[in-house]
């Protein structure tokens, strides 16, 4: 992972989602509790 993606404690930075992205994530979660990494990335780029 890129150095700017981690916080001071070495953990990955929290992703901030827009309202639209949050709604999409909630819809996906309703049907499938375990989103694939690929699907999370697709929603993040929406």
Swiss-Prot record:
CDD domains attached to this UniProt entry: homeodomain
Keyword terms of this UniProt record: Developmental protein, DNA-binding, Homeobox, Nucleus, Transcription, Transcription regulation
Keyword ATP-binding recorded: no
Locations listed in the record: Nucleus
InterPro entries: Antp_homeobox, HD, Homeodomain-like_sf
Role: Sequence-specific transcription factor which is part of a developmental regulatory system that provides cells with specific positional identities on the anterior-posterior axis.
Name of the protein: Homeobox protein Hox-B5
């Amino acid at each position: 992972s890129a150095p700017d993606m981690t916080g001071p404690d070495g953990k990955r930075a929290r992703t901030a989602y827009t309202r639209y992205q949050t709604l999409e994530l909630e819809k996906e979660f309703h049907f499938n509790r375990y989103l694939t990494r690929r699907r999370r990335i697709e929603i993040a780029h929406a």
